[in-house]
Every structure is written in C-alpha cells, then in structure tokens.
C-alpha cells in the first residue's frame, strides 16, 4: 500500500510542479498588478525653513515657545530677491537667500515692528502695504538700510474694537488696480458689529479713505485674483455660513452673513437691500429671494475638504508647479493643508470644483506665496487654535519635482452631466460603469453656527465616453439641480502607467447648468 501511494506521488510530481508554477505565476502577476495600482510617486518636495521647536501642541500645559523668531506667518511678499514675512506679533522680517537649499544660509533681518496683528502684505513700488487692525500702513525704507523708517497711514476708517475676532485683511489688488481690504466680524457679546463696516470688504480710494463695496462676510481671511484679474476671497464656516465658501469678490453684492447688515444704516452705505433673505430655508431658495444675495463660486464641504479656509493664491507658473496653471490654491487652517480649486464661467457667473492637494503640514496653513522660481512658500500659525499639525507655526517651501501626479485636473459642468479631465491618460480597463458615483446635497440658510448637508440624493450615471486619448471622461447625470453640491466618488481608476488615482473624490458647486 505504501509503495503504491509513493509511486502515485512520484508520478504526480510533474503535475504538481506545473500547478505550483502556474500558481506562483498568478501570484506574481497579481502582486505586480497590485504594486502598479498602488504606486503613487511623490510629486512635490518640502523644505522646512523654520518651525516651532516643540513637538507638542501649543495648548499643552508643558509647551514652551522655541528660541528664535516666533514665525507665526501672517503675510508674505517679494521685494526684489528678498521675501518679506509679517508675523502675528507685529513684526516684518526680510529673508535673505530664501531659495537656498541650506537653511543656514537663509538670513533674517528685522524690517518693521510695533504693528497690530498684521494679516497681509503687498508690494507697491518699493514700499510695503500691510493691513493691521486699525489701518493699512505704508512702510518705506527711505535710506535703503534695510529697515522701515516711515510708517504712513494709507487707509483707515473702519470700526476697531478690542474684540479678538475683529481682524483686517489685505490689501489685495484686482485686475483693474484697485486695492481691497476685508474686515472680520467680531464674536460674542462684545462683538461690536453694529458700526464701522464689520463684515464688509472695500477699496482704498486715492485720498486714502475706505470705500465699502460688499457685505455679508464672516471671516474673509484670504483674497487673491485669478488670471483674468477677478478677485476671490475665502470665508469660514460659522454663523450664517454652513460650510467653507470661495466667493467672487465684486461691488454691490451680499454674501449671506446678516451680522454685517447694521452698517447699511450708515449715511455712507453704498447701496440698500430691498429684501433681506429669510433664514431656515434651503440655500437656493434664499438666494432667489434677495436681489443682491449671491452664491459661492465653490463650496468646500465641511470636514471632507477642511474646516477653515485661509489664503487664496492663483497658480501662474508656466508649468513650474505642475499642470495646474490658472487654478487657485486655498490654504486650510484646521486640517493643516492646501486645497485646489478649478473655476469656470457659466452664463457670466463663476462656479467649479474643489480637490484635495497637499496635506500633513506641521501647523495651520495661513498664507501662501509663490517664488520667482515657481516654488511655493507656505506660512503657518495656529494662533492658539487647534490644527492637525503638531507644531504651532512654521515656514516651508514646496517644489515640483516634475513627476506629474495622476489626479483629476478639472471637473466641468455639461448640459446633461459632467466632464472630467485627468493629468494622465486613463487605463481603458479601469473605467467601468461602477467606477463613478455621483450624489448631491445642499445647505440650509440659517443663523446657527455651521450647517449640515441636507436634501441628499444619489444620481444615476449613463453615457460614459472618453476622449483626448483617455484624458477626458464625459458622462450624463440624471436630475441635475442648481445650487447644489455634486459629490463625485471614483473607484479603481488608474492611469495607463498603472498609477492609482491619488484623490478619488471631487466636489462641484453647480450654480447654473450650461446651455451647450
């Protein structure tokens, strides 16, 4: 019996060997395929110039500030080959050799001090304009010794109080050369928002006066122009604002926060509002009820895309920062990140999509500034609030290493659906009817702090077609509805080179449906 079984095993060995070889080949192919699908090369390199020395949260009882400059970056601007950096404690430092790969060769020189929580810098000739709480100040170095010797009031005329939340931002220049300033609302019982243009944005006139232009803001902490020169600003989720919006800034409009309405009673108010939108209704319904109420160009859904947007910076680097020229980068405070926004015009109004971009910064991202070489400086400060970073402040430089990430570059509205444009061609086998899922939701217009996603719906997808050599995917979406956010979730998409899609989700704010 044993001899017969042994003979049978010996006779079966070639078959077993062949089967084992086939199994090994299958496993090998599977592992290679999985490796190809999951391989995501790094496209951006980070260089830390300065950060808080402690690894602990700044709210930790044992936290102590690091030695040296507390680089709580609140504004950045280039003056020739130097980077001017203002910090929250009221100083402006000039960084010499800021593009050096050796941080020991980057020198810091104090340019100005004694400012009241400056939150923006802008070059004007060889002067610097800085927004502090009570005014926009012109800083001038008359004798070229590297220090400001003239502090000149460029503009004032808004209410200033001791409320901690009463910030002023800017100035920012639009395509027509106008200088804009935006003003925070105060918070709490001592908010003092009833006078002095709190929650407004305005321009600086030639005589230095503040000209209020638009209202309805809560915390408009970042402003930046696109390639056309149209100005955009970020606001932050809170009272009357259910999630983070990115707005097109222009005169004569209302952005939703009714705590700013008090200044309409001023004799200097530039316009009146005949109808004030009623609260506790769908956002789209509220928009149609008032002639001046306008929607965000893009909503950044709460938590999914962050919680508190900060700076707005257009990418205009001739490809030196990747294939995203013309799009906007948005700083994110709480999630310590930088997000990306694609915009398009439909019927003369801006709308578009938002995407994750860079994350895992060591502190809250507050300011963004491109360098002449196409790299991006990221300025950070927690300011006592919380962020996902484990430091309290810092400054980093981000460079593109010429390895294009495989991501959704654009999401465009179509009369019957959407078009996706990718940075690399899709692998044809990875696109199936199950690859794309679309849902939508809106928000309630309400005075309460923040808001939930309401009226959710899932949408049937059909007619998936590719073009542009696999870089474009167009598909129909059933029951498109305006003033809703459309959430796209992708599954299993990979490029022809086998790269897995880096960010599988996108959110499009559909204010208007294009006619063709």
Predicted regions located by residue number:
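Surface-exposed, short loops/turns at beta-strand junctions within beta-sandwich domains
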Residues: 479-483
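Blade-terminus and WD-like Trp-Asp/Gly-His loop motifs, strongest in beta-propeller folds
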Residues: 466-469
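Short, surface-exposed alpha-helix to beta-strand junction/turn motifs within ectodomains of secreted
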Residues: 421-463, 488-497, 504-508
């Amino acid at each position: 019996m044993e001899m017969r079984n042994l003979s049978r095993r010996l006779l079966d060995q070639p078959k077993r060997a062949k089967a084992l070889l086939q199994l090994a080949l299958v496993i090998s192919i599977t592992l290679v395929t999985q490796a190809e699908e999951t391989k995501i090369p790094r496209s951006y390199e980070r260089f830390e110039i300065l950060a808080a020395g402690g690894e602990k949260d700044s709210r930790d009882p044992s936290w102590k500030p690091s030695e040296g400059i507390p680089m709580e970056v609140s504004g950045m601007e280039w003056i020739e080959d130097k980077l001017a950096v203002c910090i929250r404690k009221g100083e402006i430092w000039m960084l010499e050799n800021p593009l050096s790969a050796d941080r020991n060769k980057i020198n810091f020189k104090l340019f100005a001090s004694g400012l009241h929580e400056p939150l923006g810098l802008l070059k004007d000739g060889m002067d610097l304009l800085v927004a502090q709480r009570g005014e926009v100040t012109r800083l001038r170095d008359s004798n070229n010794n590297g220090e400001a010797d003239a502090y000149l009031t460029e503009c004032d005329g808004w209410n200033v109080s001791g409320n901690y939340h009463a910030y002023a931002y800017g100035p920012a220049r639009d395509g027509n050369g106008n200088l804009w300033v935006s003003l925070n609302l105060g918070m709490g019982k001592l908010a003092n928002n009833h006078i002095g243009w709190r929650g407004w944005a305005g321009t600086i006139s030639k005589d230095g006066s503040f000209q209020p232009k638009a209202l309805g803001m809560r915390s408009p902490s970042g402003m930046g122009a696109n390639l056309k020169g149209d100005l955009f600003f970020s606001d932050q989720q809170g009272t009357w604002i259910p999630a983070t919006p990115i707005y097109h800034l222009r005169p004569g409009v209302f952005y939703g926060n009714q705590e700013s309405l008090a200044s309409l009673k001023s004799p200097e108010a530039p316009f009146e509002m005949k109808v004030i939108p009623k609260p506790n209704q769908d956002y789209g319904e509220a928009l149609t009820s008032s002639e001046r109420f306008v929607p965000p160009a893009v909503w950044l859904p709460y938590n999914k895309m962050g919680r508190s947007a900060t700076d707005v910076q257009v990418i205009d680097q001739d490809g030196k920062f990747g294939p995203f020229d013309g799009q906007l980068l948005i700083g994110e405070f709480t999630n310590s990140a930088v997000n990306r926004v694609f915009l398009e015009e439909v019927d003369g109004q801006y709308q578009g999509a938002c995407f994750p971009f860079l994350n895992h910064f060591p502190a809250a991202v507050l300011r963004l500034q491109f360098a002449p070489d196409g790299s991006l400086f990221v300025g950070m400060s927690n300011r006592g609030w919380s962020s996902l970073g484990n430091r309290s402040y810092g400054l980093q430089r981000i460079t593109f290493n010429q390895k294009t990430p495989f991501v959704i570059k654009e999401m465009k509205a179509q009369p019957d659906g959407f078009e996706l444009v990718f940075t690399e061609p899709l692998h044809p086998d990875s696109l199936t009817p199950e690859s794309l899922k679309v849902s939508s939701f809106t928000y309630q217009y309400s005075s309460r702090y923040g808001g939930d996603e309401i009226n959710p719906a899932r949408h049937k997808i059909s007619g998936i077609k590719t073009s542009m050599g696999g870089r474009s995917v167009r598909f129909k979406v059933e029951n498109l509805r305006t003033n809703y956010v459309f959430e796209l979730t992708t599954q299993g998409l990979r490029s022809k080179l086998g790269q897995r899609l880096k960010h599988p989700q996108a959110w499009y704010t559909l204010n208007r449906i294009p006619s063709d």
